[in-house]
């Protein structure tokens, strides 16, 4: 509903275009979610064929960030632009060394939940995890949802002593959960029991970025679930990271448009 109410201009990065990805972008526009702007090499896009607006560039990663910062679009999604390049350009445009992403997924039975960290270089320290939990909780509240955080670690409490690395994740999980509660966030440490966490939580915190990325891929590409995209957590702009594997971007465009609407509503309240 928020996406249709907003119908934002959403830029989508394009590399190696094919009919499946362009049709998914067209579907988002046809359903009224957004006015979609494709960002990539125009002759390659035209060869596949589309009626969508195209910004011609051989550097979609850079152009996406420029369009977002200049506010020529209301939101952007990575699409099939290169991950490392797009995120590096985004950091440079924002003047930040690090960014946090929060993924929105659906399980095979349609249960929605948020997940972090999802980048292999994210969430590898206690301070990183706490920052993600704090920013993630604020982000989730913008949807009118009260976050319930499920912190995961590498084993059960009874496994302490079997492996030093597992022991470390268990200790970190206990500490992170305690600090989150002190910050006024509803959080619980579920150890390695993700199957229990998903029953009670709507925000899953993985032990590190590698395991978070594996959870995302397992659910979205092997387990019959769906990954809508991973929003970069920031106040002034909307950027949704996407995986090139699935090839479907309709829901990511819908998410970006909805987030743009929420940002505009929040700015009205602030000002």
UniProtKB/Swiss-Prot annotation:
UniProt-recorded Gene Ontology molecular function terms: methyltransferase activity
E.C. designation(s): 2.1.1.-
Subunit composition and interactions: May be part of a complex composed of 3 subunits; MtxA, MtxH and MtxX.
InterPro entries, per the entry: MeTrfase_MtxX_xsu (IPR016764)
Full protein name: Putative methyltransferase mtx subunit X
Transferase recorded as keyword: yes
Gene: mtxX
UniProt GO BP: methylation
Keywords annotated in UniProt: Methyltransferase, Transferase
Annotated coiled-coil segments of the chain: none
Leading EC class: transferase
Recorded family membership: Belongs to the MtxX family.
């Amino acid at each position: 509903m928020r996406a249709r109410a907003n119908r934002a201009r959403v830029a989508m990065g394009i590399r190696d275009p094919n009919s499946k990805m362009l049709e998914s972008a067209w579907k988002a526009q046809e359903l009224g979610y957004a006015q979609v702007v494709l960002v990539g090499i125009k002759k390659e896009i035209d060869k596949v064929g589309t009626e969508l607006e195209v910004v011609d560039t051989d550097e979609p990663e850079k152009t996406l960030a420029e369009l977002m910062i200049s506010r020529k679009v209301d939101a952007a999604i990575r699409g099939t632009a290169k991950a490392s390049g797009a995120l590096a350009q985004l950091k440079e445009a924002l003047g930040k060394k690090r960014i946090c992403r929060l993924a929105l997924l659906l399980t095979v039975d349609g249960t929605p939940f948020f997940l972090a960290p999802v980048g292999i270089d994210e969430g590898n320290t206690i301070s990183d995890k706490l920052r993600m939990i704090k920013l993630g909780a604020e982000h989730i509240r913008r949807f009118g949802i009260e976050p319930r955080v499920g912190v995961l670690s590498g084993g059960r409490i009874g496994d302490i002593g079997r492996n030093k690395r597992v022991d470390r994740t268990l200790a970190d999980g206990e500490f992170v959960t305690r600090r989150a509660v002190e910050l006024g966030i509803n959080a619980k440490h579920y150890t390695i029991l993700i199957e229990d966490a998903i029953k009670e939580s709507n925000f899953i915190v993985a032990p590190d970025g590698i395991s978070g990325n594996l959870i995302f891929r397992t659910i979205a590409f092997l387990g019959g679930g769906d990954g809508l995209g991973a929003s970069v957590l920031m106040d002034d702009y909307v950027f949704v990271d996407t995986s090139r594997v699935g090839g479907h971007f309709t829901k990511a465009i819908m998410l970006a448009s909805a987030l743009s609407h929420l940002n505009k509503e929040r700015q009205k309240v602030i000002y």
